[in-house]
Amino acid sequence: MTTTELVALLHLASPALPIGAYSYSQGLEAALDANLIHDADTARDWIASGLTDVLAHGELPFLAHQLARWHAHDTPALVTENAWFIASRESAELRRETEQMGWSLAQLCASLEWGDAARRATLAAMTPIALPTAFAYAAAAHDASADAVLAAYAFGWVENQTSAALKAVPLGQLAGQRIIVALRGAIDAAVRRALATPPDAVNTFAPQLGILSARHETQYSRLFRS
């Protein structure tokens, strides 16, 4: 990996990226309300489960395949699979989350003129667009390798989940850093599993997440949008 590719992925995984990731907890806040999370250990276990049981089987392999489709500029497959991913979201708020963040990242890519004109036109025509599809576009525009792209995406997800736990549980900063360190190995394993997953084996089935997310939509008191 070149320094340019590394810096590009650090940029994409940064919490400073203006796509609104900080405003979502992806069910963590609802899990807290259901008393599934109540301290640092249960927060770590929840985030680890989301990484290994949900992302590694669904979002990460989907991202890898969308990355390959952007490289090939396979527009029909990009559009079809993007629509499939959006339809697979288990609740209205999870669908709005991926659409809002995907749109924001796509707008950023267009404004910064990442990628060639033909691919930018394809990106602009994809509405709504899921976050992994937009992330794959940005990564492809910087010629980043698939394993590094997935690692950056997974780390950004873990970091955002940890940040949500710090605010909602609440936890201290050191507890948050311990969670991130503890999940480094799980990120590597999730990436390896995702890269070995063929397109027809991508699986976003996550009933507990779906139920908690649906409950969160009417939760009395909330900090986050999901």
Curated annotation (Swiss-Prot):
Spell out the subunit comment: UreD, UreF and UreG form a complex that acts as a GTP-hydrolysis-dependent molecular chaperone, activating the urease apoprotein by helping to assemble the nickel containing metallocenter of UreC. The UreE protein probably delivers the nickel.
- What GO CC annotations are associated with the protein? cytoplasm
General function of this protein: Required for maturation of urease via the functional incorporation of the urease nickel metallocenter.
Could you tell me where this protein is found in the cell? Cytoplasm
Is this entry keyworded Cytoplasm? Answer: yes
Q: Which family does it belong to?
A: Belongs to the UreF family.
Q: Does the keyword Transmembrane helix apply?
A: no
Q: What is this protein called?
A: Urease accessory protein UreF
**One Gene Ontology molecular-function label:** nickel cation binding
Instruction: Output the InterPro entries linked to this UniProt entry.
Output: UreF, UreF_sf
Instruction: Report keywords, A-Z.
Output: Chaperone, Cytoplasm, Nickel insertion
